[in-house]
Amino acid sequence: MKNTVRLIVLISLIPFFDLSLKALGVYGGLGVNPVETIIHATGIWGLRILIVTLLLTPLVYYSDIAFFRHFPKPIGLVAFFYTLMHFLSYALIDQSGDIKIIIVDIIQTPYLIVGWAGFLCLLFVGVASQKRLQPWFNKNRSTISGIVYTSAILAVWHYFWQAKTVEIEAGIYIATISILLLWRLRITTAKK
């Protein structure tokens, strides 16, 4: 089972390896605005993998396949990794690590406030998922799940807002997260 989990984590890191190779000039490139490409790619893959993580709960519940129960935490941590890379790309590359500029930019730009809030939610879950906190994590699983859903909603809102135009891709993410949230609510009410 551990090898399967490792394989899935490696597969989910392929976009990051691809982006890294392009950044190093091994093949292709990052286009006319490489910083924007890196920020966008890490953010979008963080959102996609977060959605996959959320998809696992209804999959386990409705299919009753225990095999999938091992994947939410490692895949969720990969989503956090991409989100962290998204923030660090913005903070260290785009803003040159200047804390004052970053704070002013976040305060003055509404979609950055929303993105920052989503990042903080995932940061909390990432820290809480450490082995030492496992008993607390397991006891508060439903709260953690709510925080992850909040992060997903904030992430898709951040993406939609920063796009400044209506994009089909953003609509797909909104619809997917809405359906997953409804499934989750149905599962939660069915258990009570």
Region annotations inferred by a language model:
Residues M1-K192:
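Membrane-embedded alpha-helical bundles that constitute the cytochrome b-like, heme-associated redox core
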